[in-house]
């Protein structure tokens, strides 16, 4: 779940290709809100050991095992939350929310990302919510926030929420043939963030400037 034009659909495609590589059953279906680019976007991914086990094309109500939340506002919205269920759903969340159209109409608008994350935690249980600022990490470590979503994919993978091997996911990135090295690097940074976010977060801090005075 995320914002259109940022690679949400691509993440679904990568999961589909990785599942195909491993010989698993897979169905993906993409859904967008009123505005596909810049609007709320979802990619439904259904994964099973065999194709015959999949009998629908969308994740059902309270039926999600994992939500990769590339934007907290979209992830915390009704359309996404109603797919979650306490005790079942895990959420890997990018804590940075993109400004919405409300900002144009109200200059005092406050980004509700933290409130959305809190509501998600209430819906599934805080122990099933894992969040970090993937936008800041991608911008600092990769030089462009466009790598936020492959970083989120690596984050969810390292958390053990995706039943696909790392090798298959990396191979899917290679077959996608778009900025392969950077996307693979972003995936690996996401894995590091999942393993030790405080260590990665320290790399995002501005460099300290030392000034020396002449005597």
Predicted regions located by residue number:
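Active-site cofactor/cluster-binding pocket
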Residues: 1, 6-215
């Amino acid at each position: 779940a995320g914002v259109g034009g940022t690679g949400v659909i691509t993440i679904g495609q990568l999961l589909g290709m990785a599942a195909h590589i491993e010989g698993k059953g897979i169905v993906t279906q993409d859904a967008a809100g009123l505005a596909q680019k810049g609007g709320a976007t979802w990619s439904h991914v259904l994964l099973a050991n065999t194709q015959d086990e999949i009998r629908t094309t969308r994740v059902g109500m309270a039926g999600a095992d994992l939500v990769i939340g590339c934007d907290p506002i979209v992830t915390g919205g009704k359309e996404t939350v109603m797919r979650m269920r306490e005790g079942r759903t895990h959420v890997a969340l990018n804590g940075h929310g993109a400004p919405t159209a409300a900002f144009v109409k109200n200059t005092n608008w406050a980004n509700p990302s933290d409130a959305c994350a809190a509501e998600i935690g209430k819906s599934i249980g805080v122990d099933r919510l894992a969040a970090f600022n993937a936008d800041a990490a991608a911008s600092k470590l990769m030089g462009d926030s466009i790598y936020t979503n492959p970083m989120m994919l690596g984050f969810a993978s390292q958390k053990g929420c995706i039943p696909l091997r790392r090798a298959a996911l990396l191979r899917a990135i290679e077959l996608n043939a778009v900025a392969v090295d950077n996307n693979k690097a972003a995936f690996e940074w996401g894995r590091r963030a999942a393993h030790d976010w405080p260590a990665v977060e320290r790399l995002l801090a501005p460099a300290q400037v030392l000034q020396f005075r002449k005597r």
